[in-house]
Swiss-Prot record:
Hydrolyzes both purine and pyrimidine ribonucleosides with a broad-substrate specificity. It is an enzyme of class 3 (hydrolase). Belongs to the IUNH family. RihC subfamily. The lineage of its organism: Bacteria, Pseudomonadati, Pseudomonadota, Gammaproteobacteria, Enterobacterales. This is Non-specific ribonucleoside hydrolase RihC. GO terms for biological process: purine nucleobase metabolic process; purine nucleoside catabolic process; pyrimidine nucleobase metabolic process.
Length: 304
């Protein structure tokens, strides 16, 4: 039986690979997509998500979400993903539009209609998820679990200790981590290991139309990384759903720092139980890299 999931995303180049896997992995049933400001503005992430859905002829409803963090000024990753977030490939024009309600309400409505609890997957800042949990607490029993790409037990990627998705809206992340729902955190500890090799990347144009599109996106903004390998950060959240045996998880207490001058956005992961607090997150700490690479090749081969 396929696992029903809702995907909250901010595409973004590596988001495109994660979306492909969510659509084409035969084990998954992607029922709803929502967008959030993150890598680029929410208007651009929505446009990019709709372009991808049209490219794959996927009839999946999409709702536009939060344009700004809960309390602080927006930050983006334009330096990584470019001004549009997904330049480098000429997508066909289309007439698709997002749903007419905010993302968190679309998630609420879909959860309440679902015949069984649904797994939420968040691969951008957690603003929409925090709004859902704070404004619609009655939805919690209908959430099977939340799987996120975000955070780190060690080094960061936008500050010395903070990972971008958490640092983009620390207050939202703190709200989510305090919520009591089951959380699986695929942070930089594993995503920095999730590398597609230059040899595999070179085969993408001959794989299928998805391979050609992804190769064009990668080459446009990450041409240097094409020679050393590309980290598939967001894809790890999807991979865990399908191939959890590839990941080593440890239950830990995790809090999000929201006050520190230099540490805001840091996920404080109490690996050794120093704080004496009960675990609230299953933290992915290691990855079977070869198994991950094999799975990626298998699922992208299906993304015709």
């Amino acid at each position: 039986m396929r696992l029903p999931i809702f995907l909250d995303t901010d595409p973004g180049i590596d988001d495109a690979v994660a979306i492909a896997a969510a659509i084409f992995a035969p084990e998954l049933d992607l029922q709803l997509m929502t967008t959030v400001a993150g890598n680029v503005s929410v208007e651009k992430t929505t446009r990019n998500a709709l372009q991808l859905l049209h490219f794959w002829n996927a009839e999946i409803p999409l709702a536009q979400g939060a344009a700004v963090p809960l309390v602080r000024a927006p930050r983006d990753a334009v330096s990584v993903h470019g001004e549009s977030g997904m330049a480098g490939y000429d997508f066909v024009e289309h007439n698709r539009k997002p749903l007419g309600i905010p993302a968190f309400l679309a998630i609420r409505d879909a959860l309440m209609r679902a015949p069984e609890p649904v797994t939420l997957v968040a691969i951008g800042p957690l603003t929409n998820i925090a709004l859902l949990l704070s404004q619609c607490p009655e939805c919690k029993p209908y959430i099977r679990r939340l799987v996120i790409m975000g955070g780190s037990a060690g080094r960061g990627n936008c500050t010395p200790n903070a990972e971008f998705n958490i640092a983009a809206d620390p207050e939202a992340a703190a709200c989510v981590f305090r919520s009591g729902i089951e959380i699986v955190m695929c942070g930089l500890d594993v995503t920095n290991q999730a590398i597609l090799t230059p040899d595999y990347l070179a085969t993408l144009p001959e794989l299928n139309r998805t391979g050609k599109m992804l190769h064009a996106l990668f080459s446009h903004y990450r041409s240097g990384s094409m020679q050393s390998g590309l980290r598939m950060h967001d894809l790890c959240a999807i991979a865990w759903l399908v191939r959890p045996e590839l990941f080593t998880l440890k239950p830990c207490f995790v809090a999000v720092e929201t006050q520190g001058e230099f540490t805001s956005g840091t996920t404080v992961v109490d690996i050794d139980g120093c704080l004496g607090k009960p675990a609230n997150v299953k933290v992915a700490l290691d990855l079977d890299v070869k198994g991950f690479q094999q799975w990626v090749a298998e699922v992208l081969a299906l993304a015709s």
